């Protein structure tokens, strides 16, 4: 489809595809705009009269549209080109934000909020994950682990770090609703870098018939290559806790004496460590093996640190630093799943867009699954029971990853290191 980029500049040696550098910058700014409400929206809604179940449902519906959009992003990017898919995501994001803030939040109209927040949910997967497909086609295989590590670096840095730190300042300076309005400015700036300054060309595949066929491949590939499906399941588990935590942990932390600002600072610092380790585990995966990195650092590591993060306010008497450190450990090990974005598309010789569609669906589903787990279980087993469920899922993902094996004729770094 496209000739892959090969270069020897310092940018290439870092594993960052030089032709797409502006796109990476655009992603971090766009995702900062998208992440302005993640750490505070749930407690804000509770303070304004909604129940935690209503809040969980709002995030669940939002997650459903994110999951749908995530699946379509892979095949639309391959069939129509990443630029068109990303532009579609930008427009849907802006439309949804205008409706959610201007009509839903302004009047606290729950029905309007459900519909418009769902529309907003179509936005960022089409924008960000279409760019990820772009990366997989334009990067040499021996550098792909690092290239996707950089993607998750900018994705997470924008969504969870800059978004959290910016909102901790903005909500006190310009207020909650104006903070959400400002997200439109940031996504437009991000789109300028990713779509205007980024001059790299991606040639879409085929005619209308082949594009329809490409959409169907996003479903049929799981039958043709079941390991792609397993990879998608592992990707779901990867960030389920990340999207479950904001629904109930701010309230849990408040019970142990943490203010909203302190929680946002903890959340932002957690993902500061995460973005650093996104890069580290990109390199580690290319050398130690993608599968081993996912199993031990991602699955087992996150299973343990999820429990540590939850119990640290109890064990350490509500101390800020022990909670922060335990959260940082969880955030760092969360990056152990980064090699999935290299492993899954490498399971197939062709139809990488379809394989990425499954992986992108796996990245989108946690936005639905995480809040759904909280909404369904917290009333019966409490927040402690929910945390054990989330921890157990991580250990399950380690077991599942054992079955994601590459053909013996392939040379990608699944279990052995690759010389560079």
List PLM regions with ranges:
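Residue-level signature of mid-helix packing/kink "hotspots" within the transmembrane helices
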Residues: 63-71, 160-161, 271-275, 279, ...
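Cytoplasmic helix-loop-helix junction between adjacent transmembrane helices
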Residues: 116-155
């Amino acid at each position: 489809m496209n000739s892959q980029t090969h270069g020897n500049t310092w940018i290439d040696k870092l594993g960052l595809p030089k032709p797409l550098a502006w796109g990476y910058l655009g992603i971090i700014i766009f995702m900062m705009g998208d992440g302005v409400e993640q750490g505070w929206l749930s407690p804000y809604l509770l303070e304004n009269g909604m129940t935690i179940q209503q809040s969980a449902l709002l995030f669940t519906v939002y997650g459903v549209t994110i999951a749908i959009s995530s699946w379509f992003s892979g095949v639309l990017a391959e069939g129509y080109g990443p630029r068109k898919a990303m532009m579609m995501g930008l427009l849907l994001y802006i439309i949804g934000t205008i409706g959610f803030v201007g009509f839903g939040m302004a009047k606290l109209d729950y029905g309007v909020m459900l519909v418009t927040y769902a529309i907003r949910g179509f936005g960022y997967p089409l924008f960000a994950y279409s760019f990820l497909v772009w990366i997989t086609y334009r990067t040499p295989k021996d550098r792909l682990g690092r290239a996707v590590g950089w993607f998750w670096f900018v994705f997470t840095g924008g969504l969870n770090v800059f978004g959290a730190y910016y909102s901790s300042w903005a909500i006190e300076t310009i207020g909650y609703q104006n903070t959400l309005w400002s997200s439109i400015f940031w996504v437009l700036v991000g789109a300028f870098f990713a779509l205007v300054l980024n001059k790299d060309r991606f040639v879409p595949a085929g005619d209308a018939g082949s594009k329809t066929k490409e959409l169907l491949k996003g479903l049929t590939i799981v039958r043709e290559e079941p390991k792609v499906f397993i990879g998608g399941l592992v990707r779901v588990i990867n960030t389920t806790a990340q999207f479950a935590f904001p629904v109930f942990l701010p309230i849990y932390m408040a019970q142990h004496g943490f203010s909203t600002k302190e929680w946002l600072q903890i959340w932002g610092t957690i993902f500061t460590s995460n973005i650093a380790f996104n890069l580290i585990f990109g390199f580690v995966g290319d050398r130690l093996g993608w599968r081993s990195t996912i199993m031990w650092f991602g699955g087992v590591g996150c299973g343990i640190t999820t429990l540590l993060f939850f119990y640290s306010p109890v064990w350490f008497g509500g101390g800020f630093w022990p909670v922060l450190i335990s959260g940082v450990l969880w955030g760092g090990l969360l990056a152990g799943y980064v090699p999935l974005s290299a492993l899954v598309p490498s399971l197939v010789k062709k139809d990488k867009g379809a394989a990425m569609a499954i992986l992108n669906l796996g990245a989108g589903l946690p936005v639905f699954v995480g809040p759904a787990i909280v909404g369904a279980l917290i009333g019966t087993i409490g927040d402690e029971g929910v945390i054990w469920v989330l921890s157990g899922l991580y250990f399950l993902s380690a077991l599942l990853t054992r079955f994601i094996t590459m053909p013996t004729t392939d040379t990608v770094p699944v279990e052995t290191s690759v010389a560079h």
